[in-house]
């Protein structure tokens, strides 16, 4: 059932707001316009000139940059020229770009999340965070991004899949808009999305089981044990390897997503980036009634140490996220498990 257009929704949200809220709305509309251009590039697939080319360099994550990654980054950076944005930070750039020092907003973005999966026609997307810009004489632009996620003014992601969608939170609920080809704009499809408290699905990359810490193994063992185990109900496992696709599914159907720290080289602090991946996703999830943590600590309370800091990420149905925290901090949680599901679990480490 369709609702307001994105433009009408933003107008209603800012009708009684201040200049800052109107600036946020202006930025979101510019991002939406750029996303529709990127949608066209993505939809060309292997027929597009940017699809198979590689840039020759690596991004801050060490991933080989595709031409499409660079094009998308340039597209968003260009669309924010002249917008009320002081500085722009991206996964594809080592340092923030200064735009308008007098502006009041900062934008952090993962321009094409999941681009390594594009050859497989998996849904990919753009994740963004809008923050108040740091102010002061000779302020370093990076300071705008070294503030906790609970200070975000807005966050969202575009997903380029069977439908092109925008998931958006301005801090009071989470809305889902679908692009209407007939109308040529985003239209509200799910108003005030609410994540079900009870989860029946979990998403994790099981191939890394042997590298996880014990609490994560035990949680997964208990889910896999199903109705015969301590959870006394069956679970399904999902793994798309696309953060935006996993998040979208959880918003619609509930469940939990886990990308924990593990014992592999480079993964001890987690893998996802706090500023432009974990923070915006956590903001969206919490405003839909869910929770997001590092397994222990609330994501939105973390103060970033640097722009590209990595963190573990667990999010989804509130009860399941809280349960994982208890597996980490409450020894009695392990002691209460049935003998069959003791520390060895269903798998040998």
Curated annotation (Swiss-Prot):
UniProt-annotated location(s): Cytoplasm
InterPro entries to which the protein is assigned, alphabetical: FBPase_C_dom, FBPase_class-1, FBPase_N, FBPtase, Fructose_bisphosphatase_AS
One example GO MF annotation: magnesium ion binding
Record GO cellular component, one term: cytosol
Cofactors demanded by this protein: Mg(2+)
UniProt entry keywords in alphabetical sequence: Carbohydrate metabolism, Cytoplasm, Hydrolase, Magnesium, Metal-binding, Plasmid
Major localization class: cytoplasm
EC number: 3.1.3.11
GO biological-process terms attached to the record: fructose 1,6-bisphosphate metabolic process; fructose 6-phosphate metabolic process; fructose metabolic process; gluconeogenesis; sucrose biosynthetic process
Domain of life: Bacteria
Residues given in the record as Mg(2+) 1 binding sites: 91, 110, 112
Residues binding Mg(2+) 2: 110, 113, 277
Main enzyme class: hydrolase
Reactions this protein catalyses: beta-D-fructose 1,6-bisphosphate + H2O = beta-D-fructose 6-phosphate + phosphate
Cofactor binding note: Binds 2 magnesium ions per subunit.
Pathway assignment: Carbohydrate biosynthesis; gluconeogenesis
Pfam families per UniProt: FBPase, FBPase_C
Quaternary organization: Homotetramer.
Matches recorded under PANTHER family: FRUCTOSE-1,6-BISPHOSPHATASE-RELATED (PTHR11556), SEDOHEPTULOSE-1,7-BISPHOSPHATASE, CHLOROPLASTIC (PTHR11556:SF35)
Family assignment from sequence similarity: Belongs to the FBPase class 1 family.
Entry protein name: Fructose-1,6-bisphosphatase class 1
Species annotation: Rhizobium meliloti (strain 1021)
């Amino acid at each position: 059932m369709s609702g307001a257009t994105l433009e009408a929704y933003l107008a209603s949200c800012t009708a009684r707001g201040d200049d800052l809220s109107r600036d946020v709305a202006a930025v979101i509309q510019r991002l939406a316009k750029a996303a529709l251009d990127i949608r066209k590039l993505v939809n060309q697939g292997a027929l597009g000139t940017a699809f198979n080319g590689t840039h020759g360099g690596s991004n801050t994550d060490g991933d080989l940059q595709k031409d499409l990654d660079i094009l998308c980054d340039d597209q968003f950076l260009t669309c924010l020229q002249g917008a009320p944005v002081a500085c722009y930070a991206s996964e594809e750039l080592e340092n923030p770009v200064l735009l308008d020092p007098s502006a009041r907003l900062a934008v952090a973005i993962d321009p094409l999340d999941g681009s390594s999966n594009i050859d497989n026609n998996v849904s990919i997307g753009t994740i963004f965070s809008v923050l108040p810009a740091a102010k002061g004489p000779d302020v370093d632009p990076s300071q705008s991004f070294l503030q906790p996620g609970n200070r975000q003014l807005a966050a969202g992601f575009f997903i380029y899949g069977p439908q092109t969608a925008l998931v958006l939170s301005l801090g009071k609920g989470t809305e889902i808009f679908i692009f209407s080809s007939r109308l040529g704009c985003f239209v509200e499809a799910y108003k005030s999305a609410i994540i079900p408290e009870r989860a029946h699905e979990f998403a994790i990359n099981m191939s890394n089981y042997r590298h996880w810490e014990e609490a994560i193994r035990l949680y997964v063992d208990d889910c896999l044990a199903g109705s015969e185990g301590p959870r006394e109900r069956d679970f399904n496992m999902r793994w798309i390897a696309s953060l935006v696709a996993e998040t979208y599914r959880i918003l619609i159907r509930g469940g939990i997503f886990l990308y924990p720290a593990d014992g592999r080289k480079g993964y001890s602090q987690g893998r996802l980036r706090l500023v432009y991946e974990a923070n915006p996703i956590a903001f969206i999830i919490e405003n839909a009634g869910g929770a997001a943590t590092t397994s222990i600590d609330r994501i939105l309370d973390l103060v970033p140490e640097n722009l590209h800091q990595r963190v573990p990420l667990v999010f989804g149905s509130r009860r399941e996220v809280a349960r994982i925290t208890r597996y980490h901090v409450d020894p009695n949680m392990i002691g209460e498990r049935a003998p069959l599901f003791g520390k060895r679990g269903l798998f040998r480490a």
